[in-house]
Amino acid sequence: MTMCSGARLALLVYGILMHSSVYGSPAASGLRFPGIRPENEAYDEDGNPQQDFYDSEPPGVGSPASALRDAYALYYPAEERDVAHGILDKAYRKVLDQLSARRYLQTLMAKGLGGTPGGGADDDSEPLSKRHSDGIFTDSYSRYRKQMAVKKYLAAVLGKRYKQRVKNKGRRIPYL
């Protein structure tokens, strides 16, 4: 038993010595002593350590995200980035406003028809689905009408350049 614990103690001491010799040096731990200088470090005339160009990463090496961020900062100045962020924020707020207005309208419609906005358990879902399909049809039809109005307006403004002409074999080619 004492022999085993003696061997363990010797192994422990050996491990501590090896660990301290590898990781315990002042240069490895990053500690700097004024009188001790590592042999592999270069100094200028004033005694200041020079930057090691071989151990540091080159500017192009890094994660793809940081490279993309650096390229973005290089090609787009801060003023343009601020303008772009402002435009994005404005569009995002507009979309959020539309979504909240749509939700508010849905709650008003549900309250006006006597239902709950979530479509509670006592309410049957058939009128809700019918209203939903009617809304989809109305939305699609109104979008179609708007497109036709835009085409009519463009035809009136641009004249013959916008009108489609029939080519050989009946294919239609827009004239823009």
Swiss-Prot record:
Region of interest: Important for receptor binding: 150-158
Region (Disordered): 36-62, 115-134
Organism lineage string: Eukaryota, Metazoa, Chordata, Craniata, Vertebrata
Record-level Gene Ontology MF annotations: neuropeptide hormone activity; peptide hormone receptor binding; pituitary adenylate cyclase activating polypeptide activity; type 1 vasoactive intestinal polypeptide receptor binding; type 2 vasoactive intestinal polypeptide receptor binding
Function: PACAP is a neuropeptide involved in diverse array of physiological processes through activating the PACAP subfamily of class B1 G protein-coupled receptors: VIP receptor 1 (VIPR1), VIP receptor 2 (VIPR2), and PACAP type I receptor (ADCYAP1R1). Exerts neuroprotective and general cytoprotective effects due to anti-apoptotic, anti-inflammatory, and antioxidant actions. Promotes neuron projection development through the RAPGEF2/Rap1/B-Raf/ERK pathway. In chromaffin cells, induces long-lasting increase of intracellular calcium concentrations and neuroendocrine secretion.
Keywords: Amidation, Cleavage on pair of basic residues, Hormone, Neurogenesis, Secreted, Signal
Name this polypeptide is given: Pituitary adenylate cyclase-activating polypeptide
Cysteines engaged in disulfide bonds, as pairs: none
One matching Pfam family: Hormone_2
Keyword Signal appears in the UniProt entry: yes
Residue positions where Lysine amide is found in the record: K169
InterPro entries: Glucagon_GIP_secretin_VIP, VIP/GHRH-like
Entry's family note: Belongs to the glucagon family.
Gene3D superfamilies noted in UniProt: 6.10.250.590
Organism of this sequence: Ovis aries
Residue(s) carrying Leucine amide: L158
Superkingdom per UniProt: Eukaryota
